[in-house]
Each structure stands twice: as structure tokens, then as C-alpha cells.
Amino acid sequence: LFVGSSDVYKRQEFDMATGGAYKVTYPSCTGSMQLLLMHNGEGSFYYATEDRNACGKELRAVCGSKSVTFVTEVVTSEGWTDATTGRFDLPWTTVVGYNPDGWQAAALQWYRPFTFTCEWGNKSLQSRNIPQWLLDKDLWIRSKGVTDTVMAAINKTIDFFGEGIGVHTYYWHNYPYDTHYPDYFPAKPEFEGMISTIQKRKCHAVPYINGRLWDPAADSYTALNGASASCRKADGTLYTEIYPTSKVLNTVTCPASSLWHKIIIGLVDKIQNELHTNGVYICLLYTSPSPRDS
């Protein structure tokens, strides 16, 4: 069994005996391509999902005595159901094929052309809308807090390494860390000045926001009915997590929710327009392999 991975090929090839099973999570470091290929000396069987949205899924292969079962397991998304009609559609097709010339030929003939139809594969790196300063960045530092001590440390770092550093800023909002998300505003009073100082020294500042948590204690959770966009367990109750950094109960928001899209887009626009940052880092927008239903 050969698994689509960014790792060295020989590390992702497995002997599959009767009763053997293999599973891989896509997308991940060990599953960077949404395909499985089973081959022997006679040829290769090809199994792939053609999902141009790169939705999270688990690909599995289970060997019986005379057969192999290939399975795609996925937690469904709110975005796959039409809000008007209520119709559910799986947003991809699954394709299979057999190539007598082996797994390399199968991948070149079927998977490679598919990647060129995807957002991540249909443009070269040079043609993508990526600012040059980001491409040129070879050193990032992370700052924690908005204090004179933190700013002094940033200035000292710039003095040593020179201009062009990226400063990844945390703890810039008024509420304690990992609480009241996504209600980041107002920012700490000194933060805009901190951004300006970094930029005057010809460096770039990119603050952190969390892309998945919605604190039920946040004003916006009640005002906007956050529970309607929160992920749920199989029994219908809210899926929640407690981070050791805050020890408060947070709900996890479905990344496909139109409500969450509006919140994140609006937040990013507000951070850049009002605080004049060079960008925004959205952490954990889609993460965690544990099963969740939205």
C-alpha cells in the first residue's frame, strides 16, 4: 500500500497482509494527498477523493482474505447542506482505477491532473497574491504582551538582527488569553503604538487570533446565537474544550459556518484597518482529528 505523502516515498509504503489495516488523516503531515494506491507486481489500484476544498477526512484500507475494502470517513459540515432547501450534498467525487504500469503511472495519469484544477495547484507560487515582504521574511519572533519590557526586547532584537524581522504578537487584547474569543476588541491601549514602532523600524507586525474557539461567556455568543454555529457531539450536545492557558469552557466553531466566516473576515478587516497591522495570523482555523459533528 502506497500513501500520498510529502515524506520520503519508502517511509509511506506498507506491506498489507490478510487482516491488516491502514488509515491516514488528510490533510496532515503524513497524508498530504487524498489518495491511496495498492500495488503488486501486476499493477496498481488507485483510490482517491477529488475534493477541491480539501475537507478533512480519514482514508482507510482493510485487507480481507480475498478482498480489500477502501473507506473514506468524514465528519459532515454545515456548509454541505443548502440552507434554503435542506438538501445535503457530498462536495466531491471518489474515483477508482487500475493501472498495469504501477502506482507512479497511476498517480501521474489521474492524481496529478486533478491537482491542477484545485486552488492550491492551479497557480504557481510566483503568480499568487502573496506580498513580497512575506516571501522575503527569513526571521520571525514572537512577542507576548504589550508592555515597555516587551517593546524593549523587540527593539533589542531588531538592533541585533537588523530590519526586515517579522513580529508575531500575542496577548494584545484586553481580555485574558484564550477567553472571550472572538471578542478581541478593544485592543490594549498601547498596542497600536507598538505596531507603529515596529513598522517604523522597517519590520512587520502580525497579531494572533484563534480561528476555532467561541467562548460562551463572550457577549457575541449570546448576541449572535453562537450555539447555532458550534460543533456538536454525536448526541447533539455541544463539543467543548478547556485550554490549560485559561481553564475556561470554550465551544469549537464549525469552520464552514457562514456566521463564522462573517465574524473572522470582519475581525481581520477591523484589525488591519484600525490597528494598521501588516496581516493577521489565524491559528487553528481547522484542526483536531477528534470526531465532531456540526
Whereabouts are the PLM-identified features?
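Active-site neighborhood of glycoside hydrolase catalytic domains
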Residues: 256-288, 292-294
